[in-house]
Amino acid sequence: MKKTLGIIGGVGPLATMLIGEMIVRRTKAEKDQEHVHTIIDNDTSIPDRTAYILDNTKENPVPYLQRDAKKLAEYGAGVICIPCNTAHSFYEELQATT
């Protein structure tokens, strides 16, 4: 059984759509059923990552990212992807809690 991919989006809404398109275009599939099962949560309510990195008195985006990762896992995602450079600043914290 193939794993389901969960994408935490909205931390660059266009990046979310672009990675979705890249996955579809680069998947070697001859029919729809051979594509990667993907769940996209385009959550634009996630606070600005750069603002928090530069000033940690700003709202922390990590709890939002954790919530979305847990939600995607509950929906069946076995792998989580975040198409956002600055979100990767929180990778270790996210990895430890999800």
Question: Regions from the language model: what does each represent?
Answer:
Residues 2-63:
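N-terminal glycine-rich anion-binding loop in soluble enzyme alpha/beta folds
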Residues 60-64, 82, 86:
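Short secondary-structure boundary/capping elements
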Residues 66, 70-76:
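Non-catalytic positions within long, well-ordered alpha-helices that form the structural scaffold/packing
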